[in-house]
Amino acid sequence: MSNTQKQLALAKAAKKSVNTADTEEKNRALLAMADSLEAATADILAANRQDLEAAAGNIPESMTDRLLLDGKRICAMADGIRAVAALPNPVGEILETSTLPNGLEIVKKRVAMGVIGIIYESRPNVTSDAAALALKSGSAVVLRSGKDAFQSARAIVAALKTGLAQTRIDPDALQLIEDTGRESSYEMMRAKDYLDLLIPRGGAGLIRAVVENAVVPVIETGTGIVHIYIDKDADWDKALRIVYNAKTSRPSVCNSMEVLLVHEDIAADFLPKLERLLVRDRIEAGLPPIRFRLDPQAARHIGGEAAGADDFDTEFLDYILAVKTVASVEEAVWHIETHSTHHSDGIVTENRHAADYFTTHIDSAAVYVNASTRFTDGGEFGLGCEMGISTQKLHARGPMGLKELTSYKYIVQGTGQVRE
């Protein structure tokens, strides 16, 4: 048995302590974990510095922001755990009841998933978010961090397990796979005897590898090739504010805009205003400017590189924006449906017909009208921190909160009935 299998077995053995814990026990554990996380701030920051030093020069500036921890972010992680503790316990919820003609009473009841595996890349906050959500939803959790964030993840998990040790929940219900080699990921993908669900969080390569190789049931948290279409009837003040926020607030996250579509009737006047906002104003403010990848029509109005064959199919996660002009809302929808990963896509318009057409025909987990796509987030949706953004349709879609991490069973109460 490999070390990874041993850790999977420990989580499976400990799952009953979580599966059967009541609301008070789970909340007590989460609050202890949050306190312990804050108490370990110095250790976590020291570990994070190791990760940052190892990554220096090897990852883009925008990705460094994902990896970076400071005291404020650790406090936010702890507060995120406390927010999960404050959410209703999904386990035990009665979903449906019915009584059959023969007198059998059937209850459909929400239950814990069991053991959830998470494979993720260089985002230390995922460690605490995933642990909190899994435990509150009644499941043990096995985490497999990317190598870039491993020292941070190890320090975070050590703190969380210290908190768990003060409660009735077995600390073994939280595991961080120590082996950062690729084989440990494949062991988790094949671990159907230990894992009830596997969730990948990361770039397209990781997600594709898990979806194509896993024998464990998977919820796909897809990449975010996120589009915003500026209609000819858009309010320009709204449009500029939305585009600025959707692209620049955190370009390294999956709900950040990657492709801007602009109606050709307004492109000649709108795009230069956008260029001023995203390039010259940011340079004057000492901020990284947005670098444009332009189709031939957009290139007539602003400066930038010519868009390559793959630029409208790329999740840049950087200060790069692909820009294209379109002749109608119908063409915008066609382009999005051709290139979208069905994560989050939006329209800016004051035309109700255009908005209705867009929301009807765009098949994404979140579809926006006159708002930034950056809101696709469990916290912003009122779900607490989320396990990821599901882009598939089965079991879960969009931000995955507590309910999306559970299953259900039927309880059938009889009085001696037998089937004829």
From Swiss-Prot:
PROSITE patterns: PROA. Pfam families: Aldedh. GO terms for cellular component: cytoplasm. GO terms for molecular function: glutamate-5-semialdehyde dehydrogenase activity; NADP binding. Coiled coil: none annotated. Pathway: Amino-acid biosynthesis; L-proline biosynthesis; L-glutamate 5-semialdehyde from L-glutamate: step 2/2. It comes from the Bacteria. It is an enzyme of class 1 (oxidoreductase). InterPro entries: Ald_DH/histidinol_DH, Ald_DH_C, Ald_DH_N, Aldehyde_DH_dom, G-glutamylP_reductase_CS, Glu-5-SA_DH, GPR_dom. Keywords: Amino-acid biosynthesis, Cytoplasm, NADP, Oxidoreductase, Proline biosynthesis. Catalyzes the NADPH-dependent reduction of L-glutamate 5-phosphate into L-glutamate 5-semialdehyde and phosphate. The product spontaneously undergoes cyclization to form 1-pyrroline-5-carboxylate. This is Gamma-glutamyl phosphate reductase. It comes from Neisseria meningitidis serogroup B (strain ATCC BAA-335 / MC58).
